[in-house]
C-alpha cells in the first residue's frame, strides 16, 4: 500500500460526490479480506441522505463530519444472515453468545479496515468514529438493525478538503514482543513515551486541560473511568437486546 505511511484522518470533505459505482467496487474488493470460516460475519449500512445523517449525528456526539461527509458507513457485526441461512437449510445455529459476537466483530473490523485502505488508495479520505460503541442503541434504532446485528464501527467518507499533519506513533519496540511478552518497566515506559510527551501540541494539550501529565488528560478528561463503566454497561445491555447475551 503506497499510502499507508502518509495516511491521516480526514474530517473535512469537498462537495464532490462519491459515486455509487466507486463505492460498490471498493466494498466488493474489501470482501476479499480475512473472515472466519468464510462466513463474512458483517454487514455495512450506507448512509447518504441528509435526514439519516442528521439522525445519526447525536450518536456520534454531533461531530460535524457525520453530517458534512458525502457518505457515512456503519459496519456491523452480523450473525443474523448466517443464522437465517442455517435455519432455512435445516441446520441448528448456536450463535446467540459472546464468542459469536467476538467473531463477528472481528470480521466486521477487518472488513472496515480493508475498505479504508482501498478507499485511501483511490484518494478518498476517511475518519474512523470510535463513538459507534459508545451509544450503539441510538444507531440500532436509526438504522433499524435486527437481532444478532450490532454496529461496531463508523466511517465518514469523501474527497479530502484538508491535509492535516501526520500524527505521531510509538516506536516499533513499544508494541513488538519477541517470542514472549516483555512487560514494561518504568524505564521502558519513559523511553517509549518521551517523544509523544515532548511534542509541542501535546504539551499545550496538557496545559489547556490544567493537568500535570499527558496521561492525566486521557484518564481524567477524555476517557474517564466513570464514562468507560457507564458505556460498558450500555454495550452489555445492547448485546443482550440484540441476542448475543442471554
Show where each model-derived region lies:
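Acidic, surface-exposed loops and disordered segments
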Residues: 1-246
